[in-house]
């Protein structure tokens, strides 16, 4: 356990981790402070951060299991102590860590007798088990046990429905949230005019509290970026019903207008989430610290190909968007 003395900055606003510990493989704890804040700011930030931590961070879970020769979820299999339903409930609790985009397949293939644990799951290279000791089933006889698994990365909660059922394949309610709990508290100082925000984070081990805080912060920033680029001339106040309709206005409209007025285009003011890239391309670029159009143009085609999960088709799609809307191209090689 790491614990630091709480010292309050009186000038620069800053986050600081004051306590960090690992209670188990599936329970991490971290306590952070943000200061100095003026009265009211701590509650505003604390509420937004807690919601982002609990609802916006992606996690990886098993969402579907395929058995051979099972008639329904509550059937039993000869040579296995647990029923199909109990095995599904055990698989629901398996904690995974990954940089997966979308879904992938995994499996378990083992011969009894013996215990089946998370360690026996055969995973693709980009997915790993957090706690290999998690129990799945007990094979009481020398039988061959094989099941297929579907793994998905998402956020929030997935609830199975009857429409999700297939022959021999069963969906699992999936809790994707890596953050198990988050609390915030506020301490006042300086004649009650300034505040310190305390934020406590518990995670399931797939992310550390510090990683969770960083991802939640990035997600909140992404939510507010559109407001930074909204132009007042696109807001039309209607006196009749006192509403403000927002006309459709994309970054491409902004570029066209700048060119028409012969004004210089600021590449660092255009963020990649404004470029309408597919989710896979956007996530790959973001994880490689490419956030703006200027960041993107500082990379060659060869640099982008080296990004994990990036393919030539993705680069071609980027080149198409850059050429169509900006008349720009990526350098073939920066060396």
Curated annotation (Swiss-Prot):
From the Swiss-Prot or TrEMBL record, give the protein name: DNA-directed RNA polymerase subunit alpha
- Enzyme category, top tier: transferase
Molecular function as annotated in GO? DNA binding; DNA-directed RNA polymerase activity; protein dimerization activity
Stretches the record annotates as Alpha C-terminal domain (alpha-CTD): 262-335
| Signal sequence coordinates | none
Main role?
DNA-dependent RNA polymerase catalyzes the transcription of DNA into RNA using the four ribonucleoside triphosphates as substrates.
E.C. number(s) listed in UniProt: 2.7.7.6
Q: Which GO terms describe its cellular component?
A: DNA-directed RNA polymerase complex; mitochondrion; plastid
Give the family per the record: Belongs to the RNA polymerase alpha chain family.
Chain segments carrying region Alpha N-terminal domain (alpha-NTD): 1-231
Q: Can you state which reaction this protein catalyses? A: RNA(n) + a ribonucleoside 5'-triphosphate = RNA(n+1) + diphosphate
The UniProt subunit note reads as follows:
In plastids the minimal PEP RNA polymerase catalytic core is composed of four subunits: alpha, beta, beta', and beta''. When a (nuclear-encoded) sigma factor is associated with the core the holoenzyme is formed, which can initiate transcription.
Q: Which GO terms describe its biological process?
A: DNA-templated transcription
Question: What superkingdom does the record give?
Answer: Eukaryota
Where in the cell does this protein reside? Plastid
Sorted UniProt keywords: DNA-directed RNA polymerase, Nucleotidyltransferase, Plastid, Transcription, Transferase
Q: Does the keyword Methyltransferase apply?
A: no
Question: What S-S linkages are listed for this chain?
Answer: none
InterPro entries cross-referenced by the UniProt entry:
DNA-dir_RNA_pol_insert, DNA-dir_RNA_pol_RpoA/D/Rpb3, DNA-dir_RpoA, RBP11-like, RNAP_asu_C, RNApol_insert_sf
Q: What is the taxonomic lineage of the source species?
A: Eukaryota, Viridiplantae, Streptophyta, Embryophyta, Tracheophyta
């Amino acid at each position: 356990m790491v614990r630091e003395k709480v010292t309050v900055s009186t000038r620069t606003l800053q986050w600081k981790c004051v306590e960090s510990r690992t209670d188990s493989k599936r329970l991490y704890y971290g306590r952070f402070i943000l200061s100095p804040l003026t009265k009211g700011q701590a509650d505003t930030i604390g509420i937004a951060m807690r919601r982002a931590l609990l609802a916006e961070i992606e996690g990886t879970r098993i969402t579907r299991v395929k058995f051979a020769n099972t008639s329904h979820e509550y059937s039993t299999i000869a040579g296995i102590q647990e029923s199909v339903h109990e095995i599904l409930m055990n698989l629901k609790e398996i904690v995974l860590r990954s940089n997966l985009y979308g879904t992938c397949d995994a499996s378990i293939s083992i011969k009894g007798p013996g215990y089946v644990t998370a360690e026996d799951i055969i995973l693709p290279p980009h997915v790993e088990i957090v706690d290999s000791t998690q129990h799945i089933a007990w094979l009481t006889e020398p039988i061959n046990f094989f099941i297929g698994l579907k793994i998905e990365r998402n956020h929030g909660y997935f609830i199975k429905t009857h429409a999700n059922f297939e022959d021999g394949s069963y969906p699992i309610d999936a809790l994707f949230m890596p953050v198990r709990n988050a609390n915030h508290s506020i301490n006042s100082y300086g004649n009650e005019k300034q505040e310190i925000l305390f934020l406590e984070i518990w995670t399931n081990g797939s992310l550390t509290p510090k990683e969770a805080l960083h991802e939640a912060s990035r997600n909140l920033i992404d939510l507010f970026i559109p407001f930074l680029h909204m132009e007042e001339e696109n807001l039309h106040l209607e006196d009749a019903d006192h509403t403000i309709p927002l006309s459709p206005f994309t970054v491409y409209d902004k570029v066209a207008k700048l060119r028409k007025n012969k004004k210089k285009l600021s590449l660092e003011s255009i963020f990649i989430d404004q470029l309408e890239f597919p989710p896979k391309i956007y996530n790959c670029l973001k994880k490689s610290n490419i956030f703006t159009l200027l960041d993107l143009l500082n990379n060659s085609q060869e640099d982008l190909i080296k990004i994990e999960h990036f393919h030539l088709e993705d680069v071609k799609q980027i080149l198409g968007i850059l050429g169509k809307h900006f008349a720009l191209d990526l350098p073939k090689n920066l060396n």
